[in-house]
Amino acid sequence: MERKENCSSEGVLYYARILFVWVCLLGNVGHAVAKRLKVEVETPGTLPELVGKKAKYKVTDLTLKGTLNGRDLCFLREMAGRDKERQSTPGRLRTLDMRGVSFARGGGGYVRHGEWREVQGEHTLPPYLFSECGLAHIVLPERLDTIAEGALGATRISRIVLPENV
């Protein structure tokens, strides 16, 4: 009498392959989903701690409120695809709402563009801030009165919301 096996090695291998594909697909779902984040920076220089290392390169849509200094701006550039030396990063930030932001001196340079660039004033979008970054949409601070040289240069921005007084 011939014995039938319910679990042939070929059948097990087939189902193991299917299971492996599903695990791979499900494991990558988190990377494909856009991540939105709202952050209030009460103390200038603390954006890196508020966002965290794990979320830094995953956030695609960020709303900021508070006062930012050079350290925060350096971190923000990295989130948007460029570091302070203007080298590419894995940052995926594409939408940035800075409506409730002002700037504070301090925290060091955030980008080297000929020379180290630093915050110039409370209501001035700093020079070369988003130069060469991957942003597509940006809402500028409500109280902004000046956009410094190159602040939005060489970007992929397709939509900018300007405050009335600029």
Task: Report each predicted region and the residues it spans.
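N-terminal secretory signal peptides that target proteins for export/translocation
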Residues: 1-15
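Sec/Tat signal peptide C-region and signal peptidase I cleavage site
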Residues: 29-34
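N-terminal extracellular ligand-recognition/capping segment immediately after the signal peptide
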Residues: 66-77
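Acidic Gly/Asp/Thr-rich repetitive segments characteristic of extracellular carbohydrate-active
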Residues: 38-59, 77
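Bacterial N-terminal signal peptides
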Residues: 16-28
